[in-house]
């Protein structure tokens, strides 16, 4: 088997809140004196580009996973995990020690996000919905 077919690729993308109008933008992360989310593409043989300066604290990376409704899960999202016997809320964080995306709550700490993948729903994020952080602490 061809080795390039054995490698599973994950889409690398980011989101952040634009400083100019407060909207969420998605694309590539570029850093320097300021932080931008940007995208580029070719049209009619010319390279076109857009970029938005973003609030640094709102930058979050795509986890490569989707919730039960098919929505992309990003760092900083707040998830609801519901089964017949559980109702829990989690914040999505990157653990640099285990090199894994984790669902963090007060009840279950440091559990790999993929353990709950089929039962989770995005209900907001820590930036637009700070009141959801209280649910995580319950």
Please place each PLM-identified region on the residue numbering.
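Secondary-structure transition motif
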Residues: 1-138
């Amino acid at each position: 088997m061809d080795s390039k077919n054995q490698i599973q690729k994950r889409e690398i993308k980011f989101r952040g809140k634009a400083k100019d109008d407060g909207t969420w933008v998605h694309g590539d992360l570029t850093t320097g004196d300021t932080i931008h989310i940007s995208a580029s593409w070719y049209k009619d043989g010319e390279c076109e580009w857009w970029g938005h300066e973003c609030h640094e604290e709102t930058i979050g990376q795509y986890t490569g996973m989707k919730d039960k409704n098919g929505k992309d899960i990003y760092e900083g999202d707040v998830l609801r995990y519901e089964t017949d016997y559980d109702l829990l809320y989690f914040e999505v964080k990157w653990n640099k020690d285990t090199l894994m995306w984790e669902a963090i709550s007060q009840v279950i700490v440091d559990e790999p996000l993929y353990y709950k993948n089929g039962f989770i729903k995005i209900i907001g994020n820590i930036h637009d919905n700070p009141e959801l952080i209280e649910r995580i602490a319950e």
